[in-house]
Design a protein with these regions (language model features):
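Short beta-strand-to-loop acidic/aromatic patch adjacent to the donor-nucleotide binding site
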Residues: 87-98
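A conserved acidic beta->alpha catalytic loop
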Residues: 44-53, 97
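Short beta-strand/loop segment that forms part of the nucleotide-sugar
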Residues: 15, 27-28, 37-47, 63, ...
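Short, high-confidence coil segments that cap the C-terminus of an alpha-helix
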Residues: 87-88, 115-116, 195
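Acceptor/aglycone-binding surface of glycosyltransferases and processive sugar-polymer synthases
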Residues: 65-84, 101-180, 207-229
């Protein structure tokens, strides 16, 4: 798994992938057309639909999990690779096509203003090109309030996976990233540890192919309870000085 020599060593774009055969080629090509010459680190999380075979043919650094370990594990694998490779900046984006690569320069510009991590938000301004379903929007608001109460940081779109971060954040999350449904838990953990978190409007779009993991009713039911419990555990660990 050698790095290609034509890559700008300044940063990496980490894309966790699970069964995104219908979307991933377009995402990689769109990133390249945007003029961003950074390494694209695609972490295939045990896909069963041909995503890995497709990624092997694309201009990416491919890391494969032998089985599906979950979104958080895939992100953590990508961050660990980026840190080990010496990248100073990491962009995290999804493989489902909802995150628009041409928005990345805006995230980086906000990072340069002093933030440690920048969140691309669907809820600021007229940022989305699609309407977020009502229940999902209510869930985002709930976890935003939870992050404010527990982490002391007001972020409107705490479930956004479209982020740019400095190396210090990447190093921390490479070891502390939650395995399942990280969302608010990550924001709370970063807020409690006094990382500087910024949020800017970012355009999103609808998924064109495949099925979101949130469409699974069992996982959707489990999600809020797991996140609340994990968030309190993070708070208790910090209070007790274990981390």
């Amino acid at each position: 798994m050698g790095l290609r020599q034509d890559i700008d060593k300044e940063g990496a774009i980490v894309i966790p992938v699970f069964n995104e055969e219908g979307n991933i080629r377009a995402i990689v090509e769109e990133v390249r057309r945007s003029g961003i010459a950074w390494d694209i680190v695609a972490v295939d999380d045990g896909s069963t639909d041909g995503s890995r075979e497709l990624l092997e043919k694309l201009p990416v650094t491919l890391i494969s999990h032998p089985v599906n370990l979950g979104y958080g594990a895939a992100v953590q694998t990508g961050l660990r690779h980026a840190v080990a490779a010496g990248y100073g900046t990491v962009v995290l984006m999804d493989a489902d096509g909802q995150h628009i690569p041409s928005e990345i320069p805006n995230l980086l510009a906000a990072l340069e203003k002093g933030a440690d991590i920048v969140i691309g938000s669907r809820l600021l301004g007229n940022s989305s090109v699609y309407r977020i379903p009502f229940l999902r929007r209510m869930g985002i608001k709930f976890f935003s309030a939870l992050a404010k109460i527990l982490g002391g940081t007001k972020i409107y779109d705490v479930t956004s996976g479209f982020q740019a971060m400095r190396r210090n954040v990447a190093q921390f999350l490479a070891e502390e990233y939650p395995v399942d449904f990280p969302d608010a838990e990550v924001i709370i953990s970063l807020g409690l540890r006094k990382f500087r978190i910024a949020e800017i409007p970012a355009r999103f779009r609808r998924r064109e192919h495949g099925i979101s993991m949130y469409s699974n009713p069992i996982r959707a039911f489990y999600y809020p309870f797991k996140t609340i419990l994990a968030s309190f555990i993070v708070l208790l660990r910090i209070i007790r000085g274990k981390k």
